[in-house]
Amino acid sequence: MHPDTRSQPFAPLFDDVIVLTGPTASGKTELALRVAETLAARTNGRQEIEILSLDAIAVYRGMDIGSAKPTSDQLARAPHHLIDLVDPWDEFSVAEYLHSAHACVQDILERSKRPMFVGGTPMYLKGVLRGFDAGPPADEAFRNAVEEDLRQHGIGALRERLHQVDPLSAAKIDRGDSRRMIRALEFARATGTPISHRQLQFDTARSSHEGLVFALRVPRPVLHQRIEKRVEEMFAEGLVAEVQGLLALEQPLSKTSRQAVGYREIIEAIAAGDAPETAAERVVFHTRRLARRQETWLRSFSEIRGLGSFESDSAPDIDQCVESMVETILSFSD
C-alpha cells in the first residue's frame, strides 16, 4: 500500500476525464477502442485517448481470463493503464486505486492526451466521479476481534451490530460483504461518526458542469446471452487452468481475489472435490447477479449519459454508439 493513501481524501476527477461504464459483458472494451480510433482520425491525431481500467479484478496480475482483460491485440490499439498493478495475494483498496488513478490522469494530461476510464466497478466509479475519503487507518486488533465474532456468530450478527451504530450502512452494504461491514464498524469506532454520513458528503458532490460520462445500456435478454457466451469462452480459453495456477502460488490469494466472480465458483468446486468445469453454471448465475447490481448502481449516478440501446453486436449498433460518443466529446472540445 502507498503509505499516504489510507487517510488521504481524493478530489473528483469528473472534470478532467471521459468515462465509459456499463454492466459486465456489455461491450465496453471494444467500444472504447473504436471511440479512441475514431476520435484520433477525426482530429488528425490532435485528440488521442489513453484508457484507464476501472475494474477491481484487472488490477491483479495473473487474473487475466476471468477478469476479461484486454487482449494483446486490443492493448496494441491504445495505451492502457491500471492493469496488473499488484499480485493476487495482495489486498488493494479503493484509496490505493485512486492514488494510482490520479497519478495516471495527471501524467496523461501533461502529455496533452485524453484520459478515458473504462469499466464497471461501482466503488471505483464513485471515487472517480465524486471523490473519496478513505478515513482512519486500519485497526488490525479490532478487525481480528470482529472477524472472530463473525466466525462464531455469523454474518447476521455482524449486520445487526453494524445496524446499531450505522443503520444506513447496514441497509446499503451487500448482505454477503463482510469486509465492508467490518470497515464501517471500524470507521464508526475510530471517528465516532457513521461512515454513511461521510459518504453522503461525496454522494452530493457534483462537477460545476455537465461532463463526459457515458453508460452502455443493454436489454436484459441480450446481456444474459452475452454473459453466457463470455463464460463459455472463458472456460474454453483456460479459466480452470488459470485458477489452478493461482491456487498453486507460494502465497494464498487475497480475500478480494478469491471472492471474484469466475474465480470463487471454481475454487469452491475444487474444494468440494467436484470437477471444476461444473462451476460454469454458477459463474453464469453470479455474473448475471453482478450485472444487475451494477445496473442498479449506475441508475444512482445523475452524471451519466445513457447511450442508445446497444442491442446486438451488429456493425450499425456499434457504429451508432461510437458516433454518439465521438460527437459529444468533440462538442465539449469546441
Swiss-Prot record:
It catalyses: adenosine(37) in tRNA + dimethylallyl diphosphate = N(6)-dimethylallyladenosine(37) in tRNA + diphosphate. The keyword Magnesium applies. PANTHER family: TRNA DIMETHYLALLYLTRANSFERASE. Keywords: ATP-binding, Magnesium, Nucleotide-binding, Transferase, tRNA processing. This is tRNA dimethylallyltransferase. Its cofactor is Mg(2+). The lineage of its organism: Bacteria, Pseudomonadati, Planctomycetota, Planctomycetia, Pirellulales. It is an enzyme of class 2 (transferase).
